Each structure stands twice: as C-alpha cells, then as structure tokens.
Amino acid sequence: MEEYQVYLELDRSRQQDFLYPLIFREYIYGLAYGHDLNRSILVENVGYDNKSSLLIVKRLITRMYQQNHLIISANDSNKNPFWGYNKNLYSQIISEGFAVVVEIPFSLQLSSSLEEAEIVKSYKNLRSIHSIFPFFEDQFTYLNYVSDVRIPYPIHLEILVQTLRYWVKDAPFFHLLRLFIYEYCNWNSLITPKKYISTFSKRNTRFFLFLYNFYVCEYESILLFLRNKSAHLRLTSFSVLFERIYFYAKIEHLVEVFAKDFSSTLSFFKDPFIHYVRYQGKSILASKNAPLLMNKWKYYLIHLWQYHFYVWSQPGTIHINQLSEHSFHFLGYFSNVRINLSAVRSQMLENSFIIEIGMKKLDTIVPIIPLIRSLAKAKFCNVLGHPISKPVWAYSSDFYIIDRFLRICRNLSHYYNGSSKKKSLYQIKYILRLSCIKTLARKHKSTVRAFLKRLGSEEFLEEFFTEEEEILSLIFPRASSTLQRLYRGRIWYLDIIFINDLVNHE
C-alpha cells in the first residue's frame, strides 16, 4: 500500500483554490448565457427566455451583492414583475455560469494531459463515438466474455457534491454548490427521489453534467488505479484524476473486503486481457479469461459503488455473457462475435481433403424493433411499423416537409452505415419515405395513390435510397466493383459526436 500513498502524494499540489471574485463577475454569466450554452454542441438549448439579456444578468449580480442569501425565493420572484415571466431564470443562469467557472481549471488540466500524451492532433477524431467500433473489430474477436455494466445514478445529489470534496478544500465553495441544489431537492429526506434529479438535470443541464461527469471520472479513476496496480499509473487520459484525500483508506477497506470474501488479494485483478469501454452511463467490460474472473470484477464493481459512493446496486443488474452466443447493445447497435466457416480444399498426392476453417467476425446489426418503437413514438409509424402521416408537419410547405424527412433519413443512414446487414436500414428508409408521401398527401387533402398519380413521378423521393451510392460514386468514379463492395460493407464515420434521438431509444 506504500506505493499507492507515494503516488497520491505526487499530485497533492493539484488541489484547487477557486477564485471567488471570478465567480461573481457578471461577464462570466453573460458569457454562459449568451454564447457558451446556446451555441454548445454538447449541451442543447436549455430554453432560456429570449427576453433575457446581459443587462438582466448584471442586475441580478447587483441584487446578489445586496442580499443576505444567494437564492431568491419563488414567492419573491412572483411578486416582482421584472422576474415574473420566468421565476427560475435567475438561478438557472447563475448555476450554469457557475459551471462555466468551475470547468476552467479541470479543462486546463485535461488539455495539459492531452499535450503530455501527444494526442492533441488526433483529439478531434477521438471525439467520434464511431471510433470505438474499429476497436471492437480489432479486439473483441479475440475475447470470450462480455458484461454490460450500467453505472448507477447516485440516490442523493449530495454524493455528487462529495466527489468534489476530494479535489477542493474550500468550504465556501461547497456552501455555494449546495445552495444551487437546494432549490430542487428536499434535503430533509435521506433519499432524494429520482424525479428531483431528473428535474434538476433538465433545468441545469451544464451544471448537472459537470457534477455527473466528475462522479463518473471518480469511479473510472479508481477502477483504472486498482486495475494497473503498479508504479506507472499516469495513464494518458486519466492523469488528472488521481488526487484523492481519503483514497488511501478506501483502498485498504476494499482490500479487506476482497480478502474476506474471496480469500485473495487485489493482485488477482491484474488481467492483461480486460477491456473497458464507456459511453455516457453505460459501459462494456470484456475479457478473454474464464467467467470466474469476470465474476470477480462484477462483485468488485458492486463493492466499489457501495463502499466508496454509497450507491446500492444489485448483482443481477450486471450480466456476464459469452460473446459467441449473446449480443451486447452499445451505441445503438447490437453487436456479437460469430464464426464464419470457409471450406478449403487441400490435396496431397492422389488424395484431396476439404478442411473447414472458422474465423471470428464482429457483427454489428441495426436493432430494428427498438428503432421502430422510436419511430412510432415520434409519430412516423405505428407500433407494428406501418408508416403514418405526420400531422404536425402537414401545415408546412412541401419543401420543408421533404427536407425534414430527408434530413432524418440521411442522419439515420449516416449513423447506421456500419451495419453488417443493410436490410433493416432499408426498412427504416422505406418507413420514412412512405410517411413523407402520406404527409404530403394529407396536406393536399388527397389519397396517396391520387397524389402520386397527379405527381406523375416519385423521382423527387429517390434520394431516400440513392444518397450513399452518389457519395461513394464521387469517391470511386471508375471502380464500380469497389463501389458495390463498399456500399454493402461497413463504413464508420469520424464526424459523429453524439447519438441521434431516434437511435437513443433507451
């Protein structure tokens, strides 16, 4: 355990002292409101009123200096006509601006970490969520077992605050942090209901994402710390995450738990064939070794959540499956490893033999049933997959209707071009194509048959099927065989940085 303590002492100087004058500068909140939030590609528009401006933010900061408390009551905002149109606007702007301020030191450390690892140039490509699938193709064909792990949400938002306690030593910082959360949570209750966390995350998107991401980074840093168990612990993307005040005692407790339950030490978990992949709150743990080791990792994660984060998780929520027999769902794809058998004729003198050679291949399949369920929820079809019209768009122009349908179809086609089998993708395109025709027919108060007959042709809808072929024909203008092979094969794009709403059907 001495090597852990020595390592943790190396980064003791990284503990943060936040500059509170910076937190109470009005231009920070103006920046958070005017630019960083509404134009962010990572955080969607949180719905601020268009009437608000930098002047409102300045008046709010002035009012904060004159108040004895930071959070103004809802009754006060209702009485004041200036704030009456949106009683949560003031706390929302402050909390989001506060998130911008506290992100600054951590983003600087992350940038320095990337520079040390010399991966800054390729950082943009690493942002693509599709970059994980080539890794699956290269590595998972050699693995045997996979486990779906969903990182549990903390039952109380105070746990998210406590994770920052290992980094920040200023008490006023946490008082300010709790004031933002107090408006949405009942702190008299020992357990915060899920609806409070949901409400808080929707109204304070960036603030909640900062707390939750820090909670996940805390979990992953401990996971990787114990996984490596060596003196060389400065992993490329996680070197900024190892400063902990009470970490040494937690490690000792985990060692005692495993020594008691499994009669082994932590060195048992040094598995060179373990692979860990995460996106948002879902992670994949895969290994080549026996299922006994995977079970050890399973109970290790449960104990980690229970003793370090005080989050209860049932063992039955983590399933361990064999890759050759079960599929795992990740990033909108169903993936599994199947064996392709190929016959090879071998001849020796006058005798000939036929030998079957099995090669493992990763299959990525479009989950047609969940995707149809998402289309039905968005009113493009019914639960059986039969296309229906979109009444909300029937009052728009023809160009707007066609453009919206084409955009959705292109996005789905772009995302699912890595599928091993394109039949399900064609079915989704057909649903959207027919839904577009029915919406246009509804707008013109006609039947589908009469609308198409009056139109005389449906060539203007052929883009639903020919877009990929046209793109690939520009790349390979003289190689028709190469074009057909690529169109039928898998294509991964490095410009996809988030999941489409229809794809994210969980």
Curated annotation (Swiss-Prot):
Signal peptide: none annotated. This is Maturase K. Keywords: Chloroplast, mRNA processing, Plastid, RNA-binding, tRNA processing. Pfam families: Intron_maturas2, MatK_N. Disulfide bonds: none annotated. It is found in: Plastid, Chloroplast. Usually encoded in the trnK tRNA gene intron. Probably assists in splicing its own and other chloroplast group II introns. One of its GO terms (cellular component) is chloroplast. The keyword 4Fe-4S does not apply. Belongs to the intron maturase 2 family. MatK subfamily. Its main location: plastid. InterPro entries: Domain_X, Maturase_MatK, Maturase_MatK_N. GO terms for molecular function: RNA binding. GO terms for biological process: mRNA processing; RNA splicing; tRNA processing. Transmembrane segments: none annotated. Coiled coil: none annotated. The gene is matK.
